[in-house]
Amino acid sequence: MSEQKIEVVGKLGSTYGIRGWLRLYSSTEETESIFDYQPWFLKIKGQWQPIELESWRYHNNDLIVKLKGSDDRESAQLLTNAEIGVDLSVFPELEEGDYYWHDLIGCQVINLEDYSMGVVTELMETGSNDVLVVRANSKDAFGKQERLIPFLYEQVVKRVDLATKTITVDWDAGF
């Protein structure tokens, strides 16, 4: 599977019932969007394996899924906690100024004074805006280990260059 780049979009939870259904935890922005991205791959024993979605539905407020070949509780239990991934090629193209989180992780962050703030390790959703979690360089002049920088395009984030994996921000290095 070396030619494919897989992105995690969710995770299987515990079994539901005796007919092979599993709870599903979607990490897509809109919960049901996970079903728009097909085919799915499950990470089993460290390897991505294709899997076919047979059916899905809501049970109370939870999503539950039925996967092909998972016809009883025992076979479903083998898939519990498996990550769900999709090939990056199934994601739609974004407009200028919009980015997928996986594109931003690993980017070097520099401020307008050319100070290297560190590397984006993850993003957080706060409700009002996304936040870059930046691991500071080991010899940070301000003694920082981590910085939280709001991803406010044009206000704070001045430029994103995915070709060079750099994000330029208007942010004081002391914060």
Swiss-Prot record:
Gene Ontology MF terms: ribosome binding
Cited InterPro entries: PRC_barrel-like_sf, PRC_RimM, RimM, RimM_N, RimM_N_sf, Transl_B-barrel_sf
Highest taxon in the source lineage: Bacteria
Places the protein is found: Cytoplasm
GO cellular component terms given for this protein: cytoplasm; ribosome
Keyword Secreted: no
Keyword Transmembrane helix (UniProt): no
Main location class: cytoplasm
One Pfam family of this chain: PRC_RimM
Gene Ontology biological process: ribosomal small subunit biogenesis; rRNA processing
Boundaries of every PRC barrel domain copy: 96-175
Signal peptide stretch: none
Keywords carried by this UniProt record: Chaperone, Cytoplasm, Ribosome biogenesis, rRNA processing
Biological role: An accessory protein needed during the final step in the assembly of 30S ribosomal subunit, possibly for assembly of the head region. Essential for efficient processing of 16S rRNA. May be needed both before and after RbfA during the maturation of 16S rRNA. It has affinity for free ribosomal 30S subunits but not for 70S ribosomes.
Comment on protein domains: The PRC barrel domain binds ribosomal protein uS19.
The protein's assembly and partners: Binds ribosomal protein uS19.
Family statement drawn from the similarity comment of this UniProt entry: Belongs to the RimM family.
Name of protein: Ribosome maturation factor RimM
Species of the source: Actinobacillus pleuropneumoniae serotype 5b (strain L20)
Phylogenetic placement of the source organism: Bacteria, Pseudomonadati, Pseudomonadota, Gammaproteobacteria, Pasteurellales
